C-alpha cells in the first residue's frame, strides 16, 4: 500500500474526546486532527513523540487531517488507523503473501452473514472449495514485549468469534486474522487481563476449528504492507 502523498509529520500533544488529537507541526503551528481509532489506544499514546497524518481535500470535512501512524517511546512505529487493516489484509491475500489464504478465485468485502446481523470483513470464494470467512483485527497493544488483543473489552469482538464458529459448523472455513500494526510486536496473545471473556471465547473458537493467524506489518510514512507470519499464543 503506497501513500501518495506520504504522510506529514508532527509531534503529539494530546488525544481527547476519543476522536480528536492535537499535533504540533515543525513550524510551531498547532493543529487538531481526526483520530480514526475508537479503542483505548493503550500504550499507543506518547505525547512529545512523532505522529504522522494524512490530509483530505474534501471541503466538507470538519477536520482535514487523519491520524495514521505514531512513534512509540522505544522508536517503534504503530498504525493508528484501524480502518487500514482490512485493506492491508486484502492486498496481502491478493499478492499471495498470506500462504494460508491462497488458491481462491474471488475476494469480496463487507458481506452480510451470520445470525447476529454481522458483516464479514473479507470473504474468499472458489468453485472447488468451501467459502472462507475472514474477520480482520488490528493489533497494536505491546506490553512487556508481548503483543495483545484486544486493548479494551470488546463485546463486538466476542460476537464475531461466535459468528465464525457458526460458519465452521455450517461447513465453511473461518479465519481470525490479526494485522499487527506495531513494529515492536513479534507474537500475539489474547489479552486475558483486559477481556477474559474474549480470551476464553478465542480458545473455544480455535478448538471449534476457527483458524487464528497473525501477520506483522512493515510501516513507514510512505507505505505499509504485511510481510510475515508471527506466532499466536492461545
Curated annotation (Swiss-Prot):
Single GO molecular function: DNA binding
PANTHER family referenced in this protein's UniProt entry, alphabetically: SUGAR FERMENTATION STIMULATION PROTEIN A
Protein name according to UniProt: Sugar fermentation stimulation protein homolog
Annotated family: Belongs to the SfsA family.
Pfam families, alphabetized: SfsA, SfsA_N
Domain of life: Bacteria
Amino acid at each position: 500500500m503506497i501513500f501518495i502523498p506520504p504522510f506529514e509529520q508532527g509531534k503529539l500533544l494530546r488525544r481527547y474526546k476519543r476522536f480528536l488529537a492535537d499535533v504540533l507541526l515543525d513550524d510551531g503551528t498547532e493543529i487538531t486532527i481526526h483520530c480514526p481509532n475508537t479503542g483505548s489506544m493503550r500504550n499507543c499514546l506518547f505525547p512529545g513523540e512523532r505522529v504522522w497524518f494524512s490530509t483530505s481535500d474534501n471541503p466538507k470535512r470538519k477536520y482535514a487531517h487523519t491520524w495514521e501512524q505514531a512513534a512509540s517511546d522505544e522508536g517503534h512505529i504503530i498504525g493508528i488507523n484501524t480502518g487500514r487493516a482490512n485493506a492491508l489484509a486484502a492486498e496481502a491475500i491478493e499478492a499471495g503473501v498470506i500462504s494460508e489464504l491462497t488458491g481462491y478465485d474471488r475476494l469480496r468485502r463487507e458481506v452480510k452473514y451470520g445470525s447476529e446481523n454481522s458483516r464479514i470483513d473479507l470473504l474468499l470464494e472458489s468453485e472447488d472449495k468451501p467459502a472462507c470467512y475472514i474477520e480482520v483485527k488490528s493489533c497494536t497493544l505491546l506490553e512487556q514485549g508481548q503483543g495483545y488483543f484486544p486493548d479494551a473489552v470488546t463485546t463486538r469482538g466476542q460476537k464475531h468469534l461466535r459468528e465464525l464458529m457458526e460458519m465452521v459448523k455450517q461447513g465453511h472455513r473461518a479465519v481470525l486474522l490479526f494485522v499487527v500494526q506495531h513494529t515492536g510486536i513479534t507474537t500475539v496473545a489474547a489479552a486475558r487481563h483486559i477481556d477474559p471473556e474474549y480470551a476464553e471465547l478465542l480458545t473455544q473458537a480455535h478448538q471449534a476449528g476457527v483458524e487464528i493467524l497473525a501477520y506483522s506489518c512493515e510501516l513507514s510514512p510512505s507505505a505499509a504492507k504485511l510481510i510475515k507470519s508471527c506466532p499466536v499464543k492461545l
